[in-house]
């Protein structure tokens, strides 16, 4: 051993690990290295959605052409639509069906009807409607069954499309005048069913045109007239054949009676709407309905009618007798009241009637 030199001993140095931990897979913030994987998954999802929608589109067009669904095809179509509802195309399914698929399918129906002329067109239209209402419409409802809770259902959209794209384009009004004697029952059914479908925005110009057609085949007819002088639609009763009725002459009291006119939009109730799904329950609160708050006026009107009929029945033998009602009779309408205004003492009402009859000269309503 040499003096002054220390022995050289081997020393092992352990390398410390990196402080950066591996990124967990469940973290939401992606990194640049994950971008190709995300793009591949997005492309696969788009291809799957495109394939699913192509299958739905092909099936719908085939139904309009008169074909049917294959075995287990309806289940596959429903699953494809459920998958589409969860994708980016979910909110556009109803709009695309209404503006693209339905218009394309009804185009074939319209061309089939326009090939015929005269009274043959009515017969072809009746056959087309029977097939559409019994075969095409139920199949469309079954295919788009997962699409629920929309503003308009698939059934309503299809019927409105048939009205606008088929019925109103074949100019049925002139043909109805020629075929009144042998009009097929399917035409009357078609007009009444299409009239029962209402747009959520109120009566449109197409709806008023449809009512003009219904008026030619249905009597009596209660519908909406297209008078533009009012702020809203007016309800009119139209008859094709007049009936003889007893003439009623109405004579007023000596005191003038002022008629109070109310805006039309306050008197006309909104039409009933057909809804499906959970959205109908959410909209129930906005539907205008009759309540028991107006029961007092109905009871008073019923009592008045009973008194008038009883008076006319007892005094039918005399010619110049009529029912007299005192001007002091309480008004039939009271606001902010939940109980009917019924007189506690009916004898007082009779005494008031006799006193007013003796004291003043009154006119009455006489039937001739």
UniProtKB/Swiss-Prot annotation:
The modification Phosphoserine is found at residue 28. Transmembrane segments: none annotated. Keywords: Phosphoprotein, Signal transduction inhibitor, Ubl conjugation. Residues 327-368 are annotated as: Disordered. GO terms for cellular component: TORC2 complex. Belongs to the PROTOR family. PANTHER family: PROLINE-RICH PROTEIN 5-LIKE, TARGET OF RAPAMYCIN COMPLEX 2 SUBUNIT BIT61-RELATED. Associates with the mTORC2 complex that regulates cellular processes including survival and organization of the cytoskeleton. Regulates the activity of the mTORC2 complex in a substrate-specific manner preventing for instance the specific phosphorylation of PKCs and thereby controlling cell migration. Plays a role in the stimulation of ZFP36-mediated mRNA decay of several ZFP36-associated mRNAs, such as TNF-alpha and GM-CSF, in response to stress. Required for ZFP36 localization to cytoplasmic stress granule (SG) and P-body (PB) in response to stress. This is Proline-rich protein 5-like. It comes from Homo sapiens (Human). The lineage of its organism: Eukaryota, Metazoa, Chordata, Craniata, Vertebrata. The gene is PRR5L.
